[in-house]
Design a protein with these regions (language model features):
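N-terminal "first-domain core" detector
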Residues: 1-30
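Beta-sheet entry/capping signal
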Residues: 3, 34-36, 53
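Compositionally biased, intrinsically disordered low-complexity segments
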Residues: 8-9, 59, 128, 148
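Short coil-to-beta transition motif at edge beta-strands of beta-rich domains
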Residues: 25-42
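Structural alpha-beta junctions
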Residues: 30, 61-62
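Single-stranded nucleic-acid-binding OB-fold domains
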Residues: 44-46
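Short beta-strand-centered aromatic/proline hotspots
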Residues: 48-60
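Contiguous surface segments at macromolecular interaction interfaces
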Residues: 64-150
Length: 150
């Protein structure tokens, strides 16, 4: 499996999260400081692995080419933008999945497809999630991408 975000590097999309759905525009209006990214591990429908946390910025990446109707920009070089390096263990997948399933049950039932995969996390949920993952190993986002590219 290709490491997360490698296709973004290859297509010049680092620093951009986009979607054609209006749900992303609604989320952008809430002025988020951070975006969390997750994947469903292969063969583990209904489970989530946290991949990264990116610091939101108003600045477009220098090489930004619009691909979607709505975009969020993140600062890939910020020390606050990280990739989680040990979040793939069964225990951590279960921790993340249980925490979020209790709060976003409908999204889990739809397996996070389409708009159901985009959710605002209220401050109390963010604080709890940050506490949950605070001891997970991380690497600065761009350093992690460089490692993934070899």
């Amino acid at each position: 499996m290709k490491p997360p975000f490698v296709s973004d590097v290859n297509e010049g999309r680092i620093g951009t999260l986009g979607a054609d759905t209006d749900k992303l525009a609604e989320l952008r209006e809430r002025l988020p400081r951070k975006v969390w990214t997750f994947i469903t591990p292969k063969g583990m429908k209904g489970k989530l692995k946290v991949i990264g946390s990116m610091w939101i910025t108003d600045e477009r990446p220098a090489n930004f080419v619009p691909k979607w109707r709505h975009n969020l920009f993140y600062d890939a070089a910020s020390p606050k933008s990280v990739l989680f390096t040990n979040s793939g263990s069964p225990e951590k997948i279960e921790e993340v999945s249980s925490y979020l399933n209790n709060r976003f049950n409908q999204a889990f039932r739809s397996n996070f497809h389409g708009e159901k995969g985009l959710h605002a996390m209220e401050a109390d949920i963010v604080r709890g999630f940050e506490k949950l993952v605070r001891d997970y190993e991380t690497v600065q986002f761009m350093e992690g991408i460089k490692e993934a590219l070899g």
